[in-house]
Amino acid sequence: GRDAFYKGSIARRMANYFEGMDGGLEYRDFSEHEGEWVEPGSVNYRGYDLYELPPNGQGYAALQMLSILKNVDLKQWSRSSAEVFHYMVEAKRLAFEDIARYYADPAFADIPLSGLLSDEYGRQRFAEIDPKQASPAFGPGEPKLEGEGDTTYLTVADESGMMVSLIQSNYRGMGSGMVADGTGFMFQDRGELFSLDPEHPNAYEPGKRPFHTIIPAFLMKDGEPIMSFGLMGGGMQPQGHVQILVNMLDYGMNIQEAGDAARFLHDGGREPTGVHGDPLGTLYLEPGVPEETVQRLRGMGHNVEIDPRGVRFGGYQAIMRDKEKGSYAGATEMRKDGTVAAY
């Protein structure tokens, strides 16, 4: 069981392995570790509630993007228009500035969780978007603080309506590439996402969880779960969640069409590791985006690149429940390995 891994011979082997290389992990780091049950946060978008896990992960970034986007009626433009891409990209840039400033282990940092998701804060951040031009640079906002690579996603559902949204990752490639003697598995390397700035909320400290990117999600309607989904791919994940929901809730696509539609990935700006990238960043688009849209986005100041490699744009899987019919619909990713199966 659990104790065999965290307190038994496996934990001793792992601790001895790191001691032999003068590493930072000790036996007590394993034996004292405890998983946590946490309450997800949510934002209502077009009458549906998206639930995401709170920091130290990046799930709240998807919620922040929707909190910003619900201040504009995207349906006044076609889904493939420059305007829709522009608003989504600028919302992403704003949310990711807050990732870099606030997202860390809440046991070690005061994080304005409620403030980040408030309607008032969403309106404030939306007001920073120029509808005609990409901003040269955004900074983090000031939400109110109350009380002063190798990733696998799986979703399953049973006949009773029980649904599970699960994601796990060793991070880059196969993780660290290090294997303790007699164990047969590689250590993950999520510690790469700590900041080495001691003043940063995400600073490297004993017993602390680093910022991480993996985020399973649920969509609810009137208090009932209707869709369990995820989209693998580092910083693409919250961007992908938002694009899937915009496709479905604003443009009426089904869950497979929502995943097949051409995506964007914006890369750049500040990072939770303390690294400050190009504030404008690069906007990667799939070849399916119309050429007219590409040229208009460039005219608006976005640094656009077309990338035909679908792997950059994430790996999507979903199950949607129709309670009235007592049935499910599944969706899978054409850009990566994935499948839908029923029993």
What are these regions (language model features)?
Residues 40, 53-56, 143-147, 205-211, ...:
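Short Gly/Pro-enriched turn/cap motifs at secondary-structure boundaries
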Residues 1-55, 126, 130-137, 142-146, ...:
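Accessory "access/gating" subregions that flank catalytic or transport cores
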Residues 11, 71-170, 182-183, 190, ...:
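Internal maturation/activation junctions in enzymes
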Residues 4-7, 12, 16-19, 232-256:
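Alpha-helical support elements that line or immediately flank enzyme active sites
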Residues 160, 208, 241, 250-311:
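Extended C-terminal subregions enriched in glycine
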Residues 49-55, 61-68, 74, 154-155, ...:
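Short, well-ordered beta-strand elements
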Residues 23-27, 162-227, 237, 243, ...:
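Active-site rim segments in enzyme catalytic domains, especially the processed small/beta chain
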Residues 38-40, 62, 149-154, 163, ...:
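Short glycine-rich loop/turn motifs
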